[in-house]
Amino acid sequence: MGVQYAILELEHHFQNKSSIYVVDNYIGLRTLVHLKNSPTGVNIILFSDNVGNNKLHNIEFIDFCKEYPTVNLSMKKTGGIFHDRFIVLDYGTANERIFLCGTSSKDAGARITSIVEDYGISKYTPVIATLLKNPTLILPQ
C-alpha cells in the first residue's frame, strides 16, 4: 500500500507541467507506464543509454505510443556519464523542480525507495542543457 501511494504521489507531481525530463539509464516498460497519465501537451523526454538485462525495446515503445497517442514522449542518449537518476519538472521555467531518485524508474513501485527534491537547481542547468543536445536514443528491436 505504501509503495503504491508513493508512486501515485510522484505521478501527481507530473500533472500541470510544461515538461518532464527523466534521466535514467535503466528504463523499461514500467518507466512508460508511470508516464501514461501525463497531460496532453507536456513535453516528456527520457534521457537514457538503456542498459541492463530488461531494457526497453522498440516494439514496447511503439505499442505504448499507439495506446497512449496523447503522450508526447521522445528519448535521447545520456552519453554514459550518469550514475544517479533524476526527474526534472518544468525545465527552464520559474516552476522548475528536480528530484533525485534512489531507484530506477523501471523498478519504481517494486521496493521502498527515496525520491528527494534537490533545491540547488542551478547546478543542474548546464548538465540538462548538454543532455538536450544529445542524439536520439535508438531502441533495440
Label every model-predicted segment.
Residues 1-18:
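Positively charged, amphipathic N-terminal segments that serve as targeting/anchoring signals
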